Amino acid sequence: MKVVSSSKARLGVVAALAISALITIQIVPASAGGVDFRKAVAGSGKGITIGLIGLDDSIGFGKDVHDSIEREAKKAGAKFVFCDGKLKGDVALACAKTFKLKKVQGYLNFNADAAASAAICKAGPQVPVIAIDIEQDPCQSAFMGADNANAGASTGKAIGNYFKKNFNCEYDAFISLEDYGVGIANELRMGGYRDGFASVCGAIPAAKLKKYDAGRLDKALEVMPDALTTLPGKNKIIVVAINDQGIQGAFSAAKAVGREKDIWAGSQGAEKTVWCDIKTNDHWLGATAYFPERYGEIGVPYLIDLIKGKKVPFQLKIKHVAINGTNIDKNFKVTGC
């Protein structure tokens, strides 16, 4: 994820590998580490109240995370308090204050505004906190979510492999749809794209690199028409985004001006909303799965452990799976394409 957000603070959430209807590409795993999913143990949360500051339930990734955490909290027998952060730091701050009033004993924080994290920590109850996908200093007891640098590098390398095999590493531009509001997650993930690509095709010349603070659907729709206008007649345009929505916007914008075949894209997330795109669009070079529908199988059991005073690893990173046209049906039930 995940990363999607407001102009000041947006998440991202998930990293891509190559998929093509014509060839098979050698890919590398998005993450060599990570923790296993753990389903909540019945009764383990009895008498405990846990909370979640959500990303934004209007976003598929955020809603999937919310639903999975609520599901596992119910299995554990814990009382669950949800407050939607709606991509805004001030809203997440109000959520933290609500948690204090409701005597939440531990919470998961998917606040999208990294700059607001200190204020949120201060306003909320002084209890164990697990950050989701975005650092929540200084009160996070653990960080759960993407292995951002490796996920980005995996995507970049896969795109590099594709361009090396098909175009001898020749390309017209490398457009990076980023999300500055999410802080270090953006730097790691988007920098990872560039590092991975450079490991195959060499460093990206400054003249070819075009970075935009446009990691969500609406922002990508805004910037891509102008970006394509600066590249008349070019048909080897690489576009990477901090999440799936950015690439959805990129393809929609390109299609509107008859240039959807001029861009070659990679995203992060492999959300359900893009499964058919990954499977059928040979210019969408793939995505690494973050499994937001299973985040609760990490967040809830480890948060309960923290509340009970048990030691928990600080890094609770997802074991990503590289999704492409040849394996998507093995990992997801893709229908209706």
Task: Go through each PLM region and give its residues.
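Short helix-capping segments at alpha-helix termini
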Residues: 74-78, 197-204, 231-232, 255-261
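Beta-alpha junction/loop-to-helix N-cap segments that form part of ligand/metal-binding clefts
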Residues: 86-148, 239, 244-250
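Short, hydrophobic alpha-helical segments
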Residues: 100, 159-167, 228, 299, ...
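Flexible loop/hinge segments that line or gate small-molecule binding clefts
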Residues: 115-150, 169-170, 174-177, 271-280, ...
